[in-house]
């Protein structure tokens, strides 16, 4: 028997003993009728107290004679005879409580407080003061147990097993990990910042169906579900695009939506099957207008959320205050694979040879545009570290984008890259109903040839275009990847509160 097995068994026995002891304490509280009170009202948060009073001296605090009311989770406790120090954690941070036997009602300190456990939720009232070491603290005159925790606080996380725990039991991660709490605060600030920016630009926030009869707006494999009342199969949406453009047809000329998309694909550090996107559509604009808007959005968000246009991500530094780089797809390929020339990329046989030399398995159904795109992804994408717009995507891989006036092989489209990963995708929208119908037909052919990610034919959307879509540009930005960048997170699971996980057997 390994040394680990007795140790694991001993730990399990200790945990069971602690759980039993905590349940017995809860039973005693139930007997007294005070198990889960709900009459304590908090008036102050720890971060607000530190911000307002943290720089004041103890003499100044005594003169102010400030009584505060706080509540939160007991994270640490140091019992020193007749007095104790407690660290209380709330949504704003942590603050220290000073608990003296003589300042509480008789019996509370020895008969109640000492029997409480780490992780319990407490309410406290008292005067602010500074300890001899200068720490802002609350001298408690009232201390109450608000919620009895039946399980102990988690240890600090480390190692693979604990990473799994962080994702599966995010509530434990948020209790124990300051960095995780900050990540999701930043995420909330990013979402709020995007909404403020969009509203200031005259956009209206809308909501479109999450379940669709025809999944559209992107090339991806959808999740399938069944609507019992209608007795039809439906799809969780892979993108809101086609519904948002229907709204532009209807006269809402600037719309945006922040919501989840679902794609039945692999899980990786950059991909989660359920993810958050912001999509916007702007009438009487083209893709160049959205390139400028994207720059302005990122510059505004970094400065308002992070307080600086400079973002540190691992060992990389991005300055969003500087103009972003711009390259065509072919320019990017030639830059990062110098032996390649544009003439070879425009020749099907030579392009296929380049792709195969890179280990790309070229499918028979692929045209030249798809081959070029695969070469780009293999040779250039990972090198696009600084904020970069890639333009001139082939029409073959851009079934919803408007063809370029001078070169119908390409579209007026861009993708936005930071740190070697795609963050956004935008283009001048295809508003030619007949061209759109043909491209849908081409997608159906690709699907019949075995391309699971090819689009469906959406006849109603073509009908909408026949009523007239104004010249329009659209943009989609991955919120999760944006938050990864802003929080220096290197896996998408760290920025999604409850990421998709394989069930524990």
Curated annotation (Swiss-Prot):
According to its UniProt record, the EC number is 6.1.1.6
Q: Where does Mg(2+) 1 bind?
A: 415, 422
Query: Which InterPro entries does the record associate with it?
Result: Aa-tRNA-synt_II (IPR004364), aa-tRNA-synth_II (IPR006195), aa-tRNA-synth_II/BPL/LPL (IPR045864), Lys-tRNA-ligase_II (IPR002313), Lys-tRNA-ligase_II_bac/euk (IPR034762), Lys-tRNA-ligase_II_N (IPR044136), Lys-tRNA-synth_II_C (IPR018149), NA-bd_OB-fold (IPR012340)
Q: Which GO terms describe its biological process?
A: lysyl-tRNA aminoacylation
Give UniProt keywords alphabetically. Aminoacyl-tRNA synthetase, ATP-binding, Cytoplasm, Ligase, Magnesium, Metal-binding, Nucleotide-binding, Protein biosynthesis
- The residues forming a coiled coil are none
Give the protein name, as stated in the record.
Lysine--tRNA ligase
Q: Which gene encodes it?
A: lysS
């Amino acid at each position: 028997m390994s040394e680990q097995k007795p140790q694991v068994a001993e730990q399990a026995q200790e945990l069971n003993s602690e759980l039993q002891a905590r349940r017995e304490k809860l039973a005693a509280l139930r007997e007294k009728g005070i198990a889960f009170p709900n009459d304590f009202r908090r008036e102050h948060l720890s971060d607000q107290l530190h911000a307002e009073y943290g720089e004041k001296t103890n003499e100044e605090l005594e003169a102010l004679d400030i009584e505060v009311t706080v509540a939160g989770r007991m994270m640490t406790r140091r019992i020193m005879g007749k007095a104790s120090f407690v660290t209380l954690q709330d949504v704003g941070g942590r603050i220290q409580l000073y608990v003296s036997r003589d300042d509480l009602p008789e019996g509370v300190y020895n008969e109640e407080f000492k029997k409480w456990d780490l992780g319990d939720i407490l309410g406290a009232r008292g005067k602010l003061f500074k300890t001899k070491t200068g720490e802002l603290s609350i001298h408690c005159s009232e201390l109450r147990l608000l919620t009895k925790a039946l399980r102990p606080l988690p240890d600090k996380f480390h190692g693979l097993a604990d990473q799994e725990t962080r994702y599966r039991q995010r509530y434990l991660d948020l209790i124990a990990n300051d960095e995780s709490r900050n990540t999701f605060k930043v995420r909330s600030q990013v979402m709020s910042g995007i909404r403020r920016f969009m509203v200031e630009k005259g956009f209206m926030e809308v909501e479109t169906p999450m379940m669709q009869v025809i999944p559209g707006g992107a090339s991806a494999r959808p999740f399938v579900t069944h609507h019992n009342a209608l007795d039809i199969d439906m799809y969780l949406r892979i993108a809101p695009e086609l519904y948002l453009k229907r709204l532009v047809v209807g006269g809402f000329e600037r719309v945006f939506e922040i919501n989840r998309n679902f794609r039945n694909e692999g899980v990786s550090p950059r991909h989660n099957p359920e993810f958050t996107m912001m999509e916007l559509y702007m009438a009487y604009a083209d893709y160049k207008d959205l390139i400028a808007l994207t720059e302005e959005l990122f510059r505004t968000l970094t400065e308002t959320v992070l307080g600086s246009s400079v973002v540190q991500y691992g060992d990389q530094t991005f300055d969003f205050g500087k103009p972003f780089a711009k390259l065509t797809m072919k320019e990017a390929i030639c830059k990062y694979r110098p032996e390649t020339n544009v003439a070879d990329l425009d020749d099907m046989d030579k392009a296929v040879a380049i792709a195969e030399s890179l280990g790309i398995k070229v499918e028979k159904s692929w045209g030249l545009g798809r081959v070029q795109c695969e070469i780009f992804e293999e040779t250039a994408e990972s090198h696009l570290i600084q904020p970069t717009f890639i333009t001139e995507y082939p029409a073959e891989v851009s079934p919803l984008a408007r063809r370029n006036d001078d070169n119908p092989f390409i579209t007026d489209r861009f993708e936005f890259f930071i740190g070697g990963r795609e963050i956004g995708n935008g283009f001048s929208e295809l508003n030619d109903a007949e061209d759109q119908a043909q491209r849908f037909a081409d997608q159906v052919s690709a699907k019949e040839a075995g391309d699971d990610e090819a689009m469906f034919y959406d006849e109603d959307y073509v009908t909408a275009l026949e009523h007239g879509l104004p010249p329009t540009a659209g943009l989609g930005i991955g919120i999760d990847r944006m938050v990864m960048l802003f929080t220096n997170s290197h896996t998408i699971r760290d920025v999604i509160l409850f990421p998709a996980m394989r069930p524990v057997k």
